[in-house]
Design a protein with these regions (language model features):
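Substrate-binding pocket helix/loop in short-chain dehydrogenase/reductase
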Residues: 113-115, 119-127, 219
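Active-site helix of classical SDR
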Residues: 138, 174, 182
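C-terminal substrate-recognition "lid" of short-chain dehydrogenase/reductases
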Residues: 96, 138, 227-256, 260-262
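Short, small/polar-rich loop/turn modules that mediate ligand/substrate recognition or access, typified
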Residues: 97, 150, 190, 195, ...
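Residue(s) in the substrate-gating loop at a strand-loop-helix junction
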Residues: 158
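Alpha-helical segment proximal to the catalytic Tyr-Lys
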Residues: 143, 187-191, 247
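Short C-terminal tail/terminal secondary-structure segment
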Residues: 2-15, 109-112, 163, 222, ...
Length: 263
């Protein structure tokens, strides 16, 4: 496993106090929603491990965070490989002396095809990343959260975690399952000081949705607010759920969808 580590102390501003003294592990943090979450956690005083399959991207983000005065490290992780996940989580705890916060965000969109034509290979690839990756992450994060005396986890689901969408059999199935996994883990660990919640973005303007202007217009039309969401808006809710401000919020599923699910 290749890693990149660099640390400096934060600036000590009021905003930096919320997560001071805590370590956060964020998957899929080299771009999009994960990148924005990592940035905001670092700005809030957390030591952040930027975990991503894109090793160079993770290193670039970690370097940017440390240059801004944060404590950060990068690690390559393949969330479809339980051993890779174990090593990445262990690296996090060893580098910063523990783990209190986790965001299981890594995911892929997969191919678009009707259920009857969806290939087994494409199905398995999406399930391995979007569902099994969350399970493997939780499985290795939870012992460290227990050792730390508690903590908070956010799993990234989707509006398709409670809705269907033509052509998205594997993606929707995985995101539905993430909600069930979130609720189960929350019930199991609530009495031991660990909160587990899920965030459900609508269609967000990230690199995953770039390149097809016609599709972009169609997706915008599905949201009553008349636009796609932003990574910043998803990160804002995620940080609230990780914070002590959400101390009695547990086992729940939180939409960030511009009214999509209310139609």
């Amino acid at each position: 496993m290749s890693t990149s580590t660099s640390t400096t102390h934060g600036t000590g501003t009021d905003a930096a106090a919320e997560f001071a003294g805590k370590t956060a592990f964020v998957t899929g943090a080299a771009s999009g929603i994960g990148l924005e979450i990592a940035r905001r956690l670092a700005a809030g005083g957390a030591a952040v491990v930027v975990a991503d399959y894109n090793e160079q991207g993770a290193q670039d983000v970690a370097r940017s965070l440390t240059e801004s005065g944060a404590r950060a490290a990068a690690v390559r992780v393949d969330v479809t490989d339980p051993e890779s996940v174990r090593r990445a989580v262990e690296f996090t705890a060893e580098t910063f002396g523990g783990l209190q916060l986790a965001v299981n965000n890594a995911g892929i969109a997969g191919t678009s095809a009707p259920t009857g034509a969806y290939t087994v290979e494409d199905w398995q690839r999406v399930i391995d990343t979007n569902l099994n990756g969350v399970f493997y992450s939780l499985r290795h994060e939870l012992p460290h959260l227990l050792a730390a005396g508690g903590g908070a986890v956010v799993n990234m689901s989707s509006i398709l975690g409670t809705n269907g969408f033509a052509g998205s059999a594997a993606y929707s199935a995985a995101k539905h399952a993430v909600v069930g996994l979130t609720k189960t883990a929350a019930v199991e660990y609530a009495a031991r000081g660990i909160r587990v919640n899920a965030v459900a973005p609508g269609f967000i303007d990230t690199p995953l949705l770039k390149g097809d202007e016609a599709q972009h217009r169609q997706l915008v039309a599905l949201h009553p607010q008349g636009r796609l969401g932003t990574a910043e808006e998803v990160a804002e809710l995620t940080l609230f759920l990780l914070s002590d401000r959400a101390s009695f919020v547990n086992g729940s599923y939180h939409l960030v969808d511009g009214g999509y699910a209310a139609r």
